[in-house]
Amino acid sequence: MNHVVIIGFMGSGKTRVGKQLSKDLGLPFIDLEKIITKRMNLSAREIFERFGEPYYRALETLVLKQLIQDQERKVISLGAGLPLQEQNEKYLRELGTVVYLKGSLATLKKRLEGSRKDPMLDGEDRDDKIKKLLKQRDPVYQKFADIQVTTGEVPFEELIKEIEEKLSAYEKN
């Protein structure tokens, strides 16, 4: 099934963009993290703290495999770390058209300021951690991207229009 798959760093706008694309395209919206947290009845942070990152990543892979079987086309927002897991490469490529929301370091720092949602930002200096993770993840996101757009530089409506135009052109080919 050719779902519209949204990937990107924490704070890149995956959920907001996904919801708007879903509305505009008339497709259901799925947030992979929300599926996991609902099934576990815990926040992502609580799952990380109680069971560890490997357990959370295994849950992501399980849900990803299930989404591939879904015959109804959807807009799907993935967790920021999912594309980094080697075992997910095959599934991610099968899932559909991948849209990478690329945020600048400044944009992401600003959006993540004060956020305690993501346990990946715990520990060392937050700005350094964001910079380090972004440097590690950006090449992986780019590898999977069928479409790439930059967030935080244009008004939201223009960003959505750009994605929809690129999506339409990509899917015609």
Tell what function each PLM region has.
Residues A80-L82, S104-A106, V154:
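Short glycine-rich anion-binding loops that position phosphate/pyrophosphate groups of nucleotides
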Residues Q20, D24, K135-N173:
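NTP-dependent small-molecule kinase module
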Residues T15:
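Walker A/P-loop
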Residues L95-D138:
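A glycine- and Lys/Arg-enriched "phosphate-lid" helix/loop adjacent to the NTP-binding pocket
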